[in-house]
């Protein structure tokens, strides 16, 4: 049965929650676990994503060692903390260049995974407008190795502030 009125839906959820609490969480410890679980559901879980982004960057670095990719990429080497979201978006755009230049399926898959992880982590600040930041095309062009090192540095900035 589908309930089309939102206030009725919330009442039914409250009834199920009450039944659940009465039947399984009668002990004080059970109630504490339930409350802590509710709090933890609201906490941001982006740090784990950023750690996985760094892992994928290391994997890309290892994969391109055997290839000769002579690309220069727009790289922000001195990111100001107030411009880190803008810089990250530039890094993600330039990362697609590596994927295209390599022509390697493994690199392509790793890049796609990394972009998904980073975008999920950025979702809370993704719509932030940062003023006074450089556009991607205004950044200095550097080789892939320097690009990846700078990318790791900016990801660490996100980890340290989460």
Swiss-Prot record:
Domain of life: Eukaryota
Glycan attachment points: 127
Keyword Cytoplasm: yes
Annotated GO biological process: cell maturation; cell-cell signaling; extrathymic T cell selection; immune response; interleukin-15-mediated signaling pathway; lymph node development; macrophage differentiation; natural killer cell differentiation
The UniProt record lists the keyword Cytoplasm: yes
InterPro entries given in the database record: 4_helix_cytokine-like_core (IPR009079), IL-15 (IPR020439), IL-15/IL-21_fam (IPR003443), IL-15_mml (IPR020466)
Keywords: Cytokine, Cytoplasm, Disulfide bond, Glycoprotein, Nucleus, Secreted, Signal
Segment forming the signal sequence: 1-29
SUPFAM superfamilies reported for this sequence: 4-helical cytokines (SSF47266)
Disulfide bonds, paired cysteine numbers: 83-133, 90-136
GO CC annotation terms, alphabetical: cytoplasm; cytosol; endosome; extracellular region; extracellular space; Golgi apparatus; nuclear speck; nucleoplasm
Pfam families attached to this UniProt entry: IL15 (PF02372)
GO molecular function: cytokine activity; cytokine receptor binding
Propeptide: 30-48
Family assignment from sequence similarity: Belongs to the IL-15/IL-21 family.
Purpose of the protein: Cytokine that plays a major role in the development of inflammatory and protective immune responses to microbial invaders and parasites by modulating immune cells of both the innate and adaptive immune systems. Stimulates the proliferation of natural killer cells, T-cells and B-cells and promotes the secretion of several cytokines. In monocytes, induces the production of IL8 and monocyte chemotactic protein 1/CCL2, two chemokines that attract neutrophils and monocytes respectively to sites of infection.
Protein name per UniProt: Interleukin-15
């Amino acid at each position: 049965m589908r309930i089309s009125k939102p206030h009725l839906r919330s009442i039914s959820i409250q009834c199920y929650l009450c039944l659940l609490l009465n039947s399984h969480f009668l002990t004080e410890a059970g109630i504490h676990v339930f409350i802590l679980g509710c709090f933890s559901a609201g906490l941001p879980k982006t740090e784990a994503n950023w750690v996985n982004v760094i892992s994928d960057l290391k994997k890309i670095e290892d994969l391109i060692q055997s290839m000769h990719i002579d690309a220069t990429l727009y790289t922000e080497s001195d990111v100001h903390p107030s411009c880190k979201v803008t810089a990250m978006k530039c890094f993600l755009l330039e990362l697609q260049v590596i994927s295209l230049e390599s022509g390697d399926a493994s690199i392509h898959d790793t890049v796609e995974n990394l972009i998904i992880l980073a975008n999920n982590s950025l979702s809370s600040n993704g719509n932030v407008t940062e003023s006074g930041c450089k556009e991607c095309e205004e950044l200095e062009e550097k080789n892939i190795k320097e690009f990846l090192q700078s990318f790791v540095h900016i990801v660490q900035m996100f980890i340290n502030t989460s």
